[in-house]
Design a protein with these regions (language model features):
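Accessory interaction regions appended to the cores of large information-processing enzymes
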Residues: 1-208
Length: 208
């Protein structure tokens, strides 16, 4: 099994001949593109739905940090059948296990929700607000003037907005207001991903 990240307009892989493609719109967002690349009858076509089901179960459980996996191309190019033990359950389990291993080897990235944030603040207090935004991994996209106020437009990870209302009120003595709206998902920085993976490993170790 070979896994690739999916994105709109991407070219199909050329390493293995694709016999059939199924695109699944995932209930939690994003897509799964399932390519059957089996040649020579290594796996009967009747078992491919079971493999797909196993993959989707593992994607929903979260093979990396317990969070949904999305926007993935899966290429199934080889396998084996047993004259007695081959059945749908066996291939569903094989699909789960193969996906888990291939997913980790594919260098997956953890995505986080990014929000557009617009802050209206008295111009003389803008510096403190900007410093706080930088500490929250926000990216300032632009600023406008409106009378005695400055409107700051930025993108900020949702994870960094915890208690932001309280912090902004403290910085500006309650003289600033803000509004937020979902924008997109982006990969977290590598240092943040390392911390999340370590925390998840410790959590699952404690649960065992």
């Amino acid at each position: 099994m070979m896994i690739e990240p999916y994105y709109e307009g991407m070219e199909q892989q050329k390493k293995y001949p694709i016999r059939n493609t199924e695109t699944v719109e995932l209930a939690w967002g994003g897509k799964l593109v399932f390519n059957t690349c089996i040649v020579g009858g290594a796996i009967d076509a009747r078992f491919m739905p079971a493999i797909l089901k196993g993959i989707m179960e593992k994607m929903e459980e979260g093979p990396l940090t317990g969070s949904y996996a999305r926007d993935i191309v899966v290429n199934v190019f080889d396998g084996k059948m047993h004259p007695v033990d081959s059945n749908e359950m066996a291939f569903k389990l094989a699909g789960r296990n193969a996906f888990k291993e291939a997913f980790k080897n594919a260098g997956p990235k953890i995505l986080e929700p990014i929000y557009d944030i617009e802050i209206t603040v008295p111009s003389e207090l803008m510096g403190g607000v900007m410093t706080d935004l930088q500490s929250r991994r926000a990216v300032v996209m632009g600023m406008d003037s409106e009378g005695m106020n400055t409107i700051i437009k930025a993108k900020i990870p949702l994870a960094e907005t915890y208690r932001y209302s309280t912090a902004l009120s403290s910085i500006t003595s309650g003289r600033a207001v803000f509004a937020m709206q979902f924008s997109e998902y982006e990969a977290v920085p590598s240092d943040v991903q390392s911390k999340l993976l370590k925390a998840y490993e410790e959590q699952t170790k404690d649960e065992e």
